[in-house]
Each structure stands twice: as C-alpha cells, then as structure tokens.
C-alpha cells in the first residue's frame, strides 16, 4: 500500500447497501474477494464512469490505522455523507463498512482478547454464539460496526489485515475449512 498513491473504489454493492464504499488497495482486496487493486485499475481504464474509481490517498491522518484525508473525503461523498472517518487497517476504530457479500467475518472475542474469523460457508455456531448469517446481519448493510469486519478470504494473508490491532496473530478461532485453506499462509505469520 505504501508503494502507490492511488487506491480504487468499488460501489457495485450499493444497490443493496447504498452507503457502502469498498476501498481496494494492493494489500486489501474487495470484501467479496472478486476484485483486487489491479482489477479496479483495469475496470476504471475500461469504464471510466463505472463503479471502480481511482482515489488518491492524499495526506496521511494516521498511516498506522490506514486513514488518509482524500480517502475520507471520497468515502464521505460516495456514502451519502453517512461515513466521515474511515480506517483501512483497524476494525475497532472507524472500520470500513461491509455490504453483505463478504467472504469472511472477523470479530473480537472479548473473553480471549483475541479475534475469531469465520468463512461464509460455515453453517455452525461460532464462539461468539452467533452463526455466520446472524453475524452478517450485524456487520452488513453499509454501517460501521466496531469490533466486526467483513472481508475477503485472501485479506487474512495480508500484512495489513487488522494490523492496527495486531494482525492475524490475534486470531484465536477459525472454522476448520477456512483454517485448512489458509494453513500455508498462516504458518508464515
């Protein structure tokens, strides 16, 4: 993320989450897992008026948490002014909103001071005493939900994954299928 001055937006999900704006960076793909930074860049070149727009970072307000002046202004304008402050790398303070098509949900488990991460195909109960569908109802819809975040599966591999709170090392629970799929990446963390 530090190597570029421009990120890309994605507003494809605004038909069902009107106030949600995805900001896609080289180290953070779209929540759905379908768009990465290069996809956003290519989509803009193909359709300059489409849902993927370049967003200059501008001056850093808090680079550690992933907050930049111009990103905040863009998100505010494109979220119908419902979101004024936005941190890319924190899910506790002013996290990115979620639409509803995210692959995974991560949330704080207060009893462990850790984080649990669950994949959308997992039908069982999580340690938060909620199933994925209940968590999705809490997180989705384009509202900031401190302590909860929707994200792509590959974002877990990123060094920017909830880095303001300690990153993937804070994960204390994952459903088995996700853990097995992510095992090679998690071993390197």
Task: For every predicted segment, state its role.
Residues 1-189:
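Cysteine-centered metal-binding/redox modules
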